[in-house]
Structure formats: structure tokens, C-alpha cells
Swiss-Prot record:
Glycosylated residues (UniProt): N39
Cystine connections: C40-C102
Record-annotated Ig-like domain positions: 20-105
Location within or outside the cell: Cell membrane
Protein name from the UniProt record: T cell receptor alpha variable 40
Keywords on record: Adaptive immunity, Cell membrane, Disulfide bond, Glycoprotein, Immunity, Immunoglobulin domain, Membrane, Receptor, Signal, T cell receptor
Name of the encoding gene: TRAV40
Pfam families: V-set
Organism: Homo sapiens (Human)
Function (record text): V region of the variable domain of T cell receptor (TR) alpha chain that participates in the antigen recognition. Alpha-beta T cell receptors are antigen specific receptors which are essential to the immune response and are present on the cell surface of T lymphocytes. Recognize peptide-major histocompatibility (MH) (pMH) complexes that are displayed by antigen presenting cells (APC), a prerequisite for efficient T cell adaptive immunity against pathogens.
Signal sequence bounds: 1-19
Taxonomic path: Eukaryota, Metazoa, Chordata, Craniata, Vertebrata
PANTHER family referenced in this protein's UniProt entry, alphabetically: T CELL RECEPTOR ALPHA VARIABLE 40, T-CELL RECEPTOR ALPHA CHAIN V REGION
Source organism superkingdom: Eukaryota
InterPro entries on file: Ig-like_dom (IPR007110), Ig-like_dom_sf (IPR036179), Ig-like_fold (IPR013783), Ig_V-set (IPR013106), TCR_variable_region (IPR051287)
Annotated GO CC locations: T cell receptor complex
Length: 105
């Protein structure tokens, strides 16, 4: 049985200045069992740390990943040096419905 899931990706900037910005994928609806890629691109004048957080309904924020120049190759699909860091969820379930945040620190 396929049911639709709503993923809401909010654009948010952490510790930002006018020279730092983050752009994320907007709201995404996918079928249960499908894969989804949530994109995060950024501009920064320095060497940032990029964070992905998730907020499930009625739950506090949870850290999904922390990415720096040193460890950016450890995460699938992205490279902080290329100023993008997508996150991929495979075989999405209804329980994955949440707000996903990409933050630049």
C-alpha cells in the first residue's frame, strides 16, 4: 500500500551574516518505499560547519549529521568543498515525515 508523505524543508541560516546563506529543497511529497534527496547548497566566505537536523512532530530537534571540510567525504552525495550537502533517505516510511533543517555554522 502506497501512502503519500509530506516532507517540509525549511530554509534556515545559523549564525549568519550577509556573506553566508543556505538554500534548501522546498516541500517534498513522495510515496512510501521511494527514495528522496533533500538538497542543501550554501555560500560562505570561510570554512563552515554544515548541520542537518530533523524535527519530528511533537519531538525536539535531533542532529542527523555534522559536516566539516575534514569529514565531508564521509557523507553520501555531497561535498562541502563544492558548497552542497544533500541528504538522501532510502525506502521512506510514514515515520520519516518531519521538518528537515540544513544549518550553516
Amino acid at each position: 500500500m502506497n501512502s503519500s508523505l509530506d516532507f517540509l524543508i525549511l530554509i534556515l541560516m545559523f549564525g549568519g551574516t550577509s556573506s553566508n546563506s543556505v538554500k534548501q529543497t522546498g516541500q517534498i511529497t513522495v510515496s512510501e518505499g521511494a527514495s528522496v534527496t533533500m538538497n542543501c547548497t550554501y555560500t560562505s566566505t570561510g570554512y563552515p560547519t554544515l548541520f542537518w537536523y530533523v524535527e519530528y512532530p511533537s519531538k525536539p530537534l535531533q542532529l542527523l549529521q555534522r559536516e566539516t571540510m575534514e569529514n565531508s567525504k564521509n557523507f553520501g552525495g555531497g561535498n562541502i568543498k563544492d558548497k552542497n550537502s544533500p541528504i538522501v533517505k532510502y525506502s521512506v516510511q510514514v515515520s520519516d515525515s518531519a521538518v528537515y533543517y540544513c544549518l550553516l555554522g
